[in-house]
């Protein structure tokens, strides 16, 4: 299934860049980790993200200040670099295509990379951690930043804490199964919308050919399909209820998700109005009532005009809000717009 393919990609997208790690390990230096003790960090924002990435970097640094001794086996104190050259530079980027340090090694799903620095490694400063920040929930970007800093501290994908270092999406995202349920329901809603649109355009074809009676069942089929969108949105909302009170709630962009649900309901209502109006127009035309047919057709046109002004959220948009990052083209967008008569 397409969903499984996409989600497999999303799992890789949350990982660092393992092949680059091997390159850095091959250079030996003094005993001990080169960042043990105090290390300075500079955050460089090269993205259009709306998040406060300076604060996010500070939060990621604070996590390892508290956790490095437990998980990496040595104390580290990350602090912001002032005017001096930093030991570590965190670069926040817009997309995978901007990843420079692991471009030749990584797959297209990677959303961050950093060198794996083991004890005894000789390094050239600054060490660079790259993180894709645009169009991702705050908590998702934070986890990726913590993950890449973990690599710099010598931790791999099999090390604890799993919710930071694992490259398995199930380990990284709380309520993962419910996220998948939400995305599944939205994908079905999108497919249902496309089915309705195809039926609508078939009805318009019969209408334009003067086959008004033959158009009636097609517009009724359209109405049924568009009305069913609301049921699928309701299923998505029910699954999303699991996000209330979950750990690390900022790994889901709740406002964006709720906005998507509301917009999909509005789209469904307008599409149902258009379908019902065209069915009534076809019935009137079949009965020879030209004025009523024209009036109902105008009603449908008004609903379609309002519908065309709405930026309908796609499954990919919802996937990003859920932290199930999908950088694929939005499938079905062209098929999802009803045609006019």
PLM features: residue spans?
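Second-shell loop/turn segments in exported
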Residues: 43-54, 131-140, 214-215, 286
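Metzincin-family zinc-dependent endopeptidase catalytic domain
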Residues: 54-144, 152
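Metalloprotease/metallohydrolase-associated module, dominated by Zn2+-dependent proteases
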Residues: 119-121, 126, 130, 135-136, ...
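C-terminal amphipathic alpha-helix
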Residues: 146, 189-192, 196-212, 273-341
């Amino acid at each position: 299934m397409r969903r499984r393919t996409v989600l497999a990609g999303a799992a890789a997208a949350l990982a660092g860049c393992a092949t680059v790690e091997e390159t850095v390990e091959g250079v030996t230096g003094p005993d001990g980790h080169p960042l043990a003790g105090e290390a300075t960090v500079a955050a460089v924002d090269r993205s259009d993200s709306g998040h406060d990435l300076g604060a996010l970097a500070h939060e990621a640094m604070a996590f390892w200040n508290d956790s490095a001794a437990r998980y990496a086996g040595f104390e580290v104190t990350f602090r912001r670099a002032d005017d001096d050259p930093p030991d570590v530079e965190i670069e926040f980027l817009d997309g995978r295509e901007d990843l420079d340090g692991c471009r030749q090694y990584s797959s297209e799903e990677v959303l961050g990379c950093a060198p794996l620095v083991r004890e005894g490694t000789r390094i050239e400063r600054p060490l660079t951690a790259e993180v894709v920040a645009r169009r991702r929930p705050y908590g998702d970007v934070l986890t990726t930043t913590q993950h890449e800093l973990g690599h710099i501290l010598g931790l791999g994908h099999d090390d604890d804490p799993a919710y930071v270092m694992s490259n398995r999406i199930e380990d990284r995202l709380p309520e993962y199964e419910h996220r998948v349920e939400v995305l599944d329901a939205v994908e079905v809603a999108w497919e249902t919308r496309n089915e309705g649109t195809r039926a609508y355009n078939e009805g318009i074809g019969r209408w334009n050919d003067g086959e008004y009676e033959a158009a009636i069942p097609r517009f009724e089929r359209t109405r049924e399909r568009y009305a069913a969108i609301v049921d699928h949105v309701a299923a998505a909302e029910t699954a999303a209820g699991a996000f209330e009170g979950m750990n690390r709630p900022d790994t889901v962009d709740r406002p964006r998700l709720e906005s998507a649900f509301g917009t999909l309901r509005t789209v469904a209502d307008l599409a149902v109005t258009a379908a019902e109006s065209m069915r009534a127009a076809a019935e009137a035309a079949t009965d020879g009532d030209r004025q009523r047919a024209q009036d109902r057709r105008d009603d449908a046109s008004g609903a379609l005009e309002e519908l065309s002004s709405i930026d309908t959220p796609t499954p990919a948009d919802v996937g990003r809000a859920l932290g199930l990052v999908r950088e694929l083209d939005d499938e079905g967008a062209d098929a999802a717009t009803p045609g006019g008569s």
